[in-house]
Amino acid sequence: MSTKTRLEPQPPDLQPPWRTAARVELQLEARAFAQDIVLPIADELDPKKGEMPRSLIDQMAAKGWFGITIPAQHGGMGLGVFEYCLVSEELARAWLSVRSILARGQGLGTQTINDDRRLGLLRRSAQGKWIGAIALSEPTAGSDLAAVQTRATREDGYWLLSGTKRWAGFALAADFIEVLARTREPKDGESSSAGLETFLVVKQPGIFPEGMTARN
């Protein structure tokens, strides 16, 4: 006889002044999605470290959840961090990896590019079509990011990245990777983080760009 896993316990109910009809509706929608859609997939894939299916990401995108905090005029829901946390908490109860994927939308990877391109990418982000990975840690640099050894050098009008990263979850399936690299050593009197910059590496899902290799 098969049994159906239940999510227990439930988070406490929202209380005034944070409780609104719209927030309760959003929370209950995410709770039902976590129970009925996410949990069965997690029960099957998580024990064997299986990859999240694209179909699940697409279902989340159809609900608009990758754009919870993106303004409505750019294709998002135009809500705030509170609403994002409500959805994130409910999804995490079923599968923590789903919460991680949710955070990779919300306009990630659009902050430092020109305005014209940013507007288009915000819309893609809200649609779940601009989902990123973040490459910070290295074999010798974990919590101390000032110890990062990856280098970025300017050559012929381009930036050349050279180094090794680790623990960059979702990197293969991502649409882009944000890579932390050092462009120069700190000068006397500067913070140890001086010279660290983030670079946006655009890629095709399932493929690493030329010159980049990976292993599990």
How should each PLM-predicted stretch be described?
Residues K49, W95-L96, D116-R118, V179:
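Short, solvent-exposed helix-helix connector turns and helix-capping sites enriched
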Residues E44-P47, I113, E138:
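Short, flexible loop segments at the rims of nucleotide/cofactor-binding pockets, characterized by
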Residues M1-A103, R124:
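Amphipathic, small/basic residue-rich leader segments at the start of a protein or domain
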Residues G80-E83, Q111-T112, A146:
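Short secondary-structure transition/capping segments
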Residues W18, S100, L119-N216:
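FAD-binding core of flavoproteins
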Residues E29, F33, L108, R151, ...:
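Residues within well-formed alpha-helices
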Residues Q106-D115:
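Helix-loop "lid/cap" segments that line or gate small-molecule binding pockets
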